[in-house]
Amino acid sequence: MGILVGLPRTGGSEKDLQLNFGKVADQQMEVRKPFLPAEWYPQSGVQLTWPHAETDWAYMLEEVQKCFIDIAREIAERELLLIVTPEPEEVKKQIAAIVNMENVRFLECGTNDTWARDHGAITMMDADGPSLLDFTFNGWGLKFASHLDNQITRHAVENGILKGRYVNRLGFVLEGGSIESDGMGTLLTTSECLLSPNRNGQKNKVEIEEYLKSVFQVRQILWLDDGYLAGDDTDSHIDTLARFCPADTIVYVQCEDETDEHYEALQAMEEQLHSFRTLNGEPYRLLALPMADKIVEEGGYLPHMLIS
């Protein structure tokens, strides 16, 4: 789950959202190609899919749009921002006086909701440049409508906003927030999400692992079997639980309160993380993030984490 997705660093004009890693990728690809970049690779921009009255944010739209405006302002001060929206003129009115419009691009496109990390393209790199892998997003296992969100990546490529080889992977359900790459041949994911019967229920774990290894050219997949956040619609996306960092490091959510409903599951997750090994057979450096205090919104638990 996530409201934004990074767009890798451009190798051409800074005014284009061309997907190209430049020198960093060139050095990487001399060793291994193709590869699925890690989260910390250089990027040229960020995609936001903007909230509107037909999204699930309708009941608090003004408050949420204010939050998105703040996010857009911070992004556009630093890098290019792609805003996907069915109403670009309305969004321009909202942000024009606040956001650096020189760094903003718009894609007019119908959308169901705002979860760009999950419905956006997943980018592979090789010596010839970027490939934009377009998987099916089915509303986290058919929980929510997603037919419009599934058109965004194709429209962005057809309109020349995202430049790269478009790769149709719509025969497989996969969200960006459900996998984590270290950029060196290892994927981290969760069993609850990827083995959900409402995603790729016709495939078993072995078949899914073989498919992911083939598509992403990775050598190992680490499956977390435990861990969740109450109120999370994604079926335990890895990006809410554990993330790769440079130097064989994994940061993860830790719960030390034995009275918390998450305690047993997150303790089991932590134990499994200690059992994981790098491709060189070494244990990972594990850094625990404190579990944030509970926030209740209209009687329901609001999943969140602390970020420094």
Regions found by a protein language model. Name each.
Residues M1-G2:
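N-terminal export leaders
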Residues V5-G6, D16:
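Ser/Thr/Pro/Gly-rich low-complexity, intrinsically disordered segments
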Residues D16-S308:
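The feature marks the mature, well-folded catalytic cores of soluble enzymes
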